[in-house]
C-alpha cells in the first residue's frame, strides 16, 4: 500500500510549520493570535451535552473596537476565569473558534490569508469580518449571568464567507 503524499503548503518553512508549539519563543507564540478577540466573548456550556454557546457579550477587559484586552499583562489577576492559552490547552479547548491561529497551527493547518502573519497587516482580520469589531453588544459587567442566555449568537463559531477565500479579495 502506498502512503498518500503530504500536501505541500505555501507556508512550509515558516516558524509555525517548522516548530512545535512548545518550541516557539514567547514572541512567536503571541504572534499566532490573529487579534479577532472571539475568545474574549462570554460563553455558556450546556451541562448535559457539553455544547458551547457564544454570546456577543465581551469580557470586562475587552476593548471591542480595538479587539484587544485593556490590561493584557494582568488579565488573569483581574479576571480569574480568563483562560490563558498554552501549547497544552489549545489542543483541547473545544470553544476556540475555527479561525483561531492557535487552533489551526495545533491542528497542523495553514493560517488564513487575513492572519497578520500572512498578510503583514493587523487590519486584515477586521477586513475579512473575522474579528468582534462592531459586534460586541455589552460587557460582562453590563449583563447578568442569568441573562447571558438572551445574548447567544452563532457567528463566533462560524467563518465568514470572505474569510474562506484563498486570498485577499480584489
UniProtKB/Swiss-Prot annotation:
Top-rank taxon: Bacteria
Which Pfam families does this entry report, sorted A to Z? CxxCxxCC (PF03692)
Q: Which InterPro entries match?
A: Puta_zinc/iron-chelating_dom (IPR005358), UCP006173 (IPR008228)
The entry assigns this protein to a family as follows: Belongs to the UPF0260 family.
Stored NCBIfam families: PRK05170.1-5, PRK05170.2-5
Q: What protein name does the entry list?
A: UPF0260 protein RPB_3505
Amino acid at each position: 500500500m502506498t502512503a498518500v503524499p503530504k500536501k505541500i503548503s505555501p507556508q512550509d518553512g515558516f516558524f509555525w510549520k517548522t516548530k512545535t508549539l512548545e518550541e516557539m519563543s514567547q514572541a512567536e507564540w503571541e504572534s499566532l493570535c490573529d487579534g479577532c478577540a472571539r475568545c474574549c466573548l462570554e460563553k455558556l456550556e450546556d451541562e448535559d451535552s457539553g455544547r458551547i454557546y457564544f454570546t456577543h457579550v465581551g469580557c470586562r477587559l475587552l476593548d471591542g473596537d480595538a479587539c484587544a484586552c485593556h490590561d493584557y499583562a494582568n488579565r488573569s489577576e483581574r479576571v480569574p476565569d480568563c483562560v490563558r492559552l498554552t501549547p497544552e490547552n489549545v489542543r483541547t479547548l473545544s470553544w476556540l473558534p475555527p479561525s483561531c491561529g492557535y487552533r489551526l497551527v495545533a491542528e497542523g493547518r495553514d493560517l488564513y490569508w487575513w492572519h497578520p502573519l500572512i498578510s503583514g497587516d493587523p487590519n486584515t482580520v477586521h477586513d475579512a469580518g473575522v474579528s468582534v469589531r462592531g459586534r460586541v453588544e455589552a460587557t460582562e459587567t453590563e449583563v447578568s449571568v442569568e441573562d447571558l442566555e438572551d445574548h447567544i449568537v452563532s457567528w463566533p463559531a462560524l467563518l465568514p464567507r470572505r474569510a474562506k477565500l484563498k486570498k485577499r479579495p480584489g
